[in-house]
């Protein structure tokens, strides 16, 4: 999920 780096 952007703009979050933890899109895993």
UniProtKB/Swiss-Prot annotation:
Binds 3 Ca(2+) ions per subunit. GO terms for molecular function: alpha-amylase activity; metal ion binding. It catalyses: Endohydrolysis of (1->4)-alpha-D-glucosidic linkages in polysaccharides containing three or more (1->4)-alpha-linked D-glucose units. Its EC number is 3.2.1.1. Its cofactor is Ca(2+). The keyword Isomerase does not apply. Keywords: Calcium, Carbohydrate metabolism, Glycosidase, Hydrolase, Metal-binding. It comes from the Eukaryota. Monomer. Belongs to the glycosyl hydrolase 13 family. This is Alpha-amylase 2.
């Amino acid at each position: 999920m952007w703009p979050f780096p933890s899109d895993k």
